[in-house]
Swiss-Prot record:
Pfam families: Cpn10. GO terms for biological process: chaperone cofactor-dependent protein refolding. PANTHER family: 10 KDA HEAT SHOCK PROTEIN (PTHR10772), CO-CHAPERONIN GROES (PTHR10772:SF58). This is Co-chaperonin GroES. Gene3D superfamilies: GroES chaperonin. One of its GO terms (cellular component) is cytoplasm. The keyword Transport does not apply. Keywords: Chaperone, Cytoplasm. Belongs to the GroES chaperonin family. InterPro entries: Chaperonin_GroES, Chaperonin_GroES_sf, Chaprnonin_Cpn10_CS, GroES-like_sf. The keyword Lipid metabolism does not apply. Together with the chaperonin GroEL, plays an essential role in assisting protein folding. The GroEL-GroES system forms a nano-cage that allows encapsulation of the non-native substrate proteins and provides a physical environment optimized to promote and accelerate protein folding. GroES binds to the apical surface of the GroEL ring, thereby capping the opening of the GroEL channel.
Length: 96
C-alpha cells in the first residue's frame, strides 16, 4: 500500500463480523451494521505535543482494534476500502 498516515493518524482495514448469532441465526446483509473492529495497516510516527516533542503511538501495524461506529474517514485505495482515524478514536486493542 502506498499510504503513509501523518502524526497520530492510523489506517485501518475493517474486519468482518460474525455472519451468525450465538443461537445459529444467520444475519442478512441488509441487517448488518458496519464492523467496529479492524486491523491497523499503517500508523503515523506519533502525536506532536504542545512542547514540540513527539509521543509515540500506543498502537502499531498489525494490531486489532475496536473503534466507534462512525469514527474516521472512509477512503478507497487500490480498490480496498479503508478508514483513516486519529489514535484518540480507537477505544481498545484486542489482545491475542
Amino acid at each position: 500500500m502506498k499510504l503513509r498516515p501523518l502524526h497520530d493518524r492510523v489506517v485501518i482495514r475493517r474486519l468482518e463480523e460474525e455472519q451468525k448469532t450465538a443461537g445459529g441465526i444467520i444475519i442478512p446483509d441488509t441487517a448488518k451494521e458496519k464492523p467496529v473492529r479492524g486491523e491497523i495497516v499503517a500508523a503515523g510516527h506519533g502525536k506532536i505535543l504542545e512542547d514540540g516533542k513527539v509521543r509515540a503511538l500506543d498502537v502499531k501495524t498489525g494490531d486489532q482494534v475496536l473503534f466507534a461506529k462512525y469514527a474516521g474517514t472512509e477512503i478507497k485505495v487500490e480498490g480496498e476500502e479503508l478508514l483513516v482515524m486519529r489514535e484518540d478514536d480507537i477505544m481498545a486493542v484486542i489482545e491475542k
